[in-house]
Structures are given as C-alpha cells and as structure tokens.
C-alpha cells in the first residue's frame, strides 16, 4: 500500500465557508462514466456554486458563456444530467441531487410493486 504524504503540505485543502463537495459515488457507481465532457463540466460548475441544499440559479446565457458552449449545447447537456439523475431543473432553478444508493436504471433486476411504491414514496422514479 502506498503511504500518502502531501506533496505540497503548505497547500492542504481546508473546508471553505461556502463548502461544496462531490460524492465519491459519482465515480464508484459509474455516474461519471455516463456523462459527456460537457455534462461533467456543467455538473462541476453547479456543484461548486450550489448552496447547502444543492440549489443555484444561473441563466442559460451565463452558463453557456462560463462553460464556453452555445446555448443549444447547454440545454442538451442539462437534459443529459437530468436524465442521468444528477440534477433537477425548473427554470430558473437548478438542484444538484443526492446520488441514489443504486444508479437509476442500473440495477438490471426486476422490482416488486412494493419496491416501486417505496421508491415513489421517497420521491424517486
């Protein structure tokens, strides 16, 4: 096992006042594998600017400018993140969503009616 020592000990990250985070399950549950580069960039931006509840609001024009993409690409990219289950969007609000225990559509197993109703009761689809 590799012993991890900081390469730049004087620059160890500290939790900032406006703390945001990326859930490790983004990688371990393969959500990131389902994202285009544009979607990963938009997700990183939204996670960075979100408040404690994952909420933010930026206009399509501003996001497109900040991410150097046209508005059509931004809309397609936003829809991609919604379909994957990483964000919710209702103009003008974005919400970075909690990552499900199992990625949506990745179980490959049948669900009982009880499981489906349980998920619906938790606000999942």
Where are these regions (language model features)?
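Short, amphipathic alpha-helical interaction segments positioned at domain boundaries
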Residues: 102-125
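Generic low-complexity, intrinsically disordered sequence content enriched
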Residues: 26, 46, 67, 85, ...
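Winged helix-turn-helix DNA-binding recognition segment
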Residues: 37, 49-102
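Charged/polar, solvent-exposed surface patches and flexible loops
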Residues: 24, 33, 65, 76, ...
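Short, structured secondary-structure boundary patches
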Residues: 19, 28, 78, 93-97, ...
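Intrinsically disordered, low-complexity N-terminal regions enriched in serine/proline/glycine
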Residues: 30, 42, 57, 88, ...
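Short recognition helix of helix-turn-helix/winged-helix DNA-binding domains
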Residues: 1-54
């Amino acid at each position: 096992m590799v012993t991890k020592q900081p390469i730049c000990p004087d620059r160890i990250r500290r939790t900032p006042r406006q703390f945001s985070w990326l859930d490790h399950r983004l990688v371990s549950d393969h959500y990131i594998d389902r994202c285009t580069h544009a979607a990963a960039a938009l997700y990183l931006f939204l996670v960075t600017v979100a408040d404690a509840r994952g909420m933010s609001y930026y206009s399509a024009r501003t996001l497109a400018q900040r991410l150097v993409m046209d508005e059509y690409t931004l809309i397609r990219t936003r829809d991609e993140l919604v379909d994957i289950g990483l964000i919710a969007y209702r103009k003008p609000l974005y919400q970075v969503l909690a990552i499900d225990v199992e990625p949506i559509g990745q179980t490959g197993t049948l669900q009982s009616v009880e499981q489906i109703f349980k998920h619906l009761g938790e606000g999942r689809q």
